[in-house]
Amino acid sequence: MAVKLQEVVDKLGMKPLSAFSRLSGECSGGYVSDLLSDVMANAKAGDLWVTLQTHQNIVAVASLKEIAGIIIIGGREPEKTTLAKADEENIPILLTNLPAFEVVGRLYQMGISGGR
């Protein structure tokens, strides 16, 4: 089921930090991992990626995999270089204070699942 990123932001109380014009876009699934190599091997185009990573390499991986957006959990603030790269690559970064387990549960309740 495809869900608009803005709906995710609104329902989970997230703070968008980059690529604001892409919030009207949709995600078609989700993936949670903190290992970049795992995301490169297993995430699908259109996924929302849930991670605690904040460095700019997450943007490179998201761009490579055509990820719909990155959710950074636990209130961790991304580096300024990460946000600049995300804007350049047009990758939405969403910030939440929630832990990964709760974020994934709420996304699932919205109809977003992994393993398509």
Task: Identify the role of each PLM range.
Residues 29:
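Conserved phosphate/pyrophosphate-binding and hydrolysis machinery centered on Walker-type P-loop NTPases
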Residues 1-20:
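N-terminal, charge-rich interaction modules
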Residues 24-25, 33-48, 52-116:
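Feature captures the catalytic cores and cofactor-binding loops of soluble hydro-lyases/lyases
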